[in-house]
């Protein structure tokens, strides 16, 4: 295949070096995908704005683009998550959030979220692959670390909305 006929896949990272296993997992998946011979895919990385420099150093042969996930992004994500909010945003020309606008600009066909990431909920048209590391919160809901500060509900809500819409789900 020529470079122009390859399917563009965005690898969406979330974690920095201080995240330990999460960072190592994301880096390992990227290395495995990039090293695959005769791949029909062209990969580019989307990293949180503050991690772009370190990500470029780690993967100098890949295009790295920034994304933001601050308060304004999360506000629009919550609006876009409801049908009424989506209709309102679509009416005023904000059908897509920042990340999806970047994906469209780059002609990305598939977004692979290498870690659980709330921004997947902001995508309207881009197909996704999502990663689930564990569902342990269901096994031990009696611990305040799991149920305190609405962590249990947060995880359940995320999985309930993100996974059914996913093209594929990777469980590790």
Regions found by a protein language model. Give the residues of each.
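Carbohydrate transferase catalytic cores enriched for Leloir-type hexosyltransferases
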Residues: 1-172
């Amino acid at each position: 295949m020529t470079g122009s006929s390859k399917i563009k896949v965005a690898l969406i990272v979330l974690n920095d070096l201080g995240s330990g296993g999460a960072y190592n997992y994301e880096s390992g998946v990227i290395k495995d995908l990039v090293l695959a011979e005769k791949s029909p895919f062209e990969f580019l990385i989307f990293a949180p704005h503050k991690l772009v420099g370190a990500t470029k150093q780690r993967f100098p042969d890949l295009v790295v683009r920034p994304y933001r996930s601050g308060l304004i992004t999360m506000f629009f994500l919550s609006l876009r998550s409801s049908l009424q909010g989506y209709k309102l945003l679509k009416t005023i020309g904000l059908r897509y959030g920042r990340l999806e606008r970047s994906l469209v600009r780059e002609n990305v066909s598939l977004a692979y979220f290498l870690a659980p990431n709330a921004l997947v909920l902001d995508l309207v048209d881009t197909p996704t692959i999502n990663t689930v590391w564990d569902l342990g919160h269901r096994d031990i809901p009696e611990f305040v670390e799991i149920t305190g500060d609405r962590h249990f509900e947060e995880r359940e809500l995320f999985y309930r909305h993100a996974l059914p819409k996913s093209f594929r789900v990777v469980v590790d």
